[in-house]
């Protein structure tokens, strides 16, 4: 599937995310992600020992499971944390999918390289898989194809009618390219107008998880299409009213700082605007699925995985964000991020994608669909997770119908 990139977007404050990374910048430093075998994971839970040295005199985590304790001593593990947190009412479903088997091992062995720690854990009895964690980055916003204002004006003047009254729809040539702009080719677009003509403008029954930077939930062109957790909205502050393991997640959750505090992000707001800016409300731009009556279309859930306010060592758990979205009825996961992966497939994210594909959509849809950007490096190869078989990967097309120079 191909899409077009445009310089027209909804703008929030400009922020970026940073992480503590390995020397090559591709992996998160000081932590190895492991999947335990079922027997070992159950023994770990049964032991009920603290999986952190914080507040103790211990120099490394002691789990009560001999093979894990041995490798913990070697790498000087200071904590083990579940990748997919306790899920309250959804915990049984998570366990059935094996999500409770995943742990992050944080270590502090002096001079130990990340690959060395991974290999030690990989060879440990009871560890089914061990990997480094890729540093995922948002895709888009930096590279785009320029179209001059004069050319856009010429095209707008030539257009006799438009389906909606949003003032910047004229500028969204990537929705309906009629070839009037010099250097463009008629039909080299995303076929959005044709979809709208068939009545497909965005249903309120469809929940789209924006797994990206947080978006501006009170933006005048987005607010009518924001997903709302009514149990938390009408509940008691500071209480997990719906007993799902998350507190006060009214519009979604911030997986960078593990909080319901959503921070508007330029990339996330841009993506949300493309997906679901309200159509026919006389404001701003149109969203692909923003409805048709000025009252909204699809509902968009905030699953924040980029936030510059966090410390440099804070790393969002992308897989946990995908699982969160599935458990709350999202049928589409919009993911404009990824990473070049060498020898470490992020199987925790693969597990999350599999879970979303099977369980997304709640009781209104038969499963879910994850949509990933193919990447903007202008390269061939496996750009993860867009290279997975179960997802739809979307590249960029130039306005003349050719592959954009920067698209993977």
Whereabouts are the PLM-identified features?
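Bacterial Sec-dependent N-terminal signal peptides
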Residues: 1-15
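Inhibitory N-terminal propeptides of secreted protease zymogens
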Residues: 13-155
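Structural recognition of the beta-strand scaffold that forms the well-ordered cores
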Residues: 32-35, 79-82, 103-106, 129-131, ...
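Short, solvent-exposed loop/turn elements at domain surfaces
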Residues: 36, 40-50, 112-116, 217-224, ...
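Protease zymogen maturation seam
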Residues: 89-104, 122-207, 215-221
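Glycine-centered tight turns that cap/initiate beta-strands
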Residues: 123-126, 221, 225, 284, ...
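Acidic-leg catalytic submotif of subtilisin-like serine proteases
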Residues: 125-128, 185-259, 270-274, 278, ...
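Substrate-binding/access-modulating region of protease and related hydrolase catalytic domains
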Residues: 190, 197-198, 202-204, 213, ...
